Amino acid sequence: MTENITKLKKQLLNNHILDISIGLVYLWFGGLKYFPELSPAEDLAKNTITSLTFGMIPDNISIILLAIWETLIGVLLLLNIYRRQVIIIALIHMVFTFTPLFLFSEQSFNNSYFYLTLLGQYIIKNIIIIGGLLTLYKLSVTKRRLL
C-alpha cells in the first residue's frame, strides 16, 4: 500500500512540475502588472491591447485586466484546477503575445527579420511556454481517455 502511494505521489509530482513552472512564470509576470511601471512589458502590453481593441479599452483598465488574466492562469496552474480549460486559455493568451512582432515590427527587429531586439527576444521566448502548454494539453487529453 505504501509503495503504491509513493508511486502515485512521484507520478503526480513529475507531471505537475511543468504546471508549476509555467504557473510561476504567469503568476510573476501577471503580478508585476498590478503595480504601475514595475513590469518591463507594461508599455508593450498597453500598446498591443490598444491596437487589438482599436482603443476601446483604456490603458489603465487593460493592464489590470491582463494582470488578472495572467495571475489567474498562474494560480490555477499551480493548484492544478480546471487544467485543460486553463491550458486552452493560456494558449490563446500566448498567441496574442506574438502580435507585437507584426504590430510593432520596428521595435521587435533590427535591420532584418532574423536580428531580434531585446523586445523581440522577450516575445520569441514564449515558444518555450507554448511547447510546455501543448505538452500539458496532450497529457490531460491522454489522461482523460484513460479514465
Predicted region positions:
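Membrane-interface extramembranous regions
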Residues: 1-72, 76-147
